Amino acid sequence: MDYLKHIDQQWLLAINGWHSEWADMLMWYISKSTTWLPLYALLVGLIVYRFGILSPSLCREGRRGSSLLRVLIILAGFAVAVGVSDFVSSGIIKPWVCRLRPTHEPALAGMLHLVNGYTGGLYGFVSSHAANTMACALLFALLYRNKYATAGLMLWVALNCYSRMYLGVHYPADIIGGLAIGALMATLTYGMVRRLVDRVDERSEGVGASCRWPEGDEDYPTADS
């Protein structure tokens, strides 16, 4: 266990030790949730388009009667996935494990490069940033099933995770734990959302009218369709 902790610290120091003024500014803004508000708006818009009344191929025989409720269920699913991930990571695991953040670890005093004096809260295991971004990204990937969107969102998750280590507020193990929680919540929420949406569609349009869920990129309209 001590060896693993040592490796964890060494990886953190290596990441945090590579710094510059421009990287400080970049990682600071990557780590801020408000930086990504336009991305969140884009994701909502894509959900509305793909699963709402504007979708050209959502339900069999053009049935779109339950489009509003369908979209609301999916958006509520995102709120549940991210909200539960945040609660589990920050409200349960951090105060239970009580692992100090690197910035509050006496053994690392004076060894970390701090950006804008930022040290974060007292405990760091697991990373809420990692959990929340993974929950959002994976749930969208499971719903939308587009390889380009999935790749872009996974890059977004990776940047957020790297920024937390660059800022010195999380060990790599904190990040890995957060990613696992976010992935679990996204997977569970995806199954729940699918069942609810199918039930709503069947009640609205009759048996056999359930949503045709995308299975891959071929399910999306192209310029030739």
What are the functions of these language-model segments?
Residues 1-40, 58-59, 89-120, 211-212, ...:
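N-terminal transmembrane-helix/juxtamembrane module of multi-pass inner/ER membrane proteins
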Residues 18, 22, 49-54, 91, ...:
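Membrane-interface elements of multi-pass transporters and channels
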Residues 29, 37, 73, 77, ...:
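Alpha-helical transmembrane segments of integral membrane proteins
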Residues 39-52, 133-141:
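Hydrophobic, aromatic-rich transmembrane alpha-helices
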Residues 44-89, 150:
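Interfacial segments of alpha-helical transmembrane regions
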Residues 78-91, 95-100, 176, 182:
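Membrane helix-loop-helix hairpins that form the core translocation module of multi-pass transporters
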Residues 113-225:
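Membrane-embedded catalytic cores of phosphoryl/pyrophosphoryl-handling enzymes
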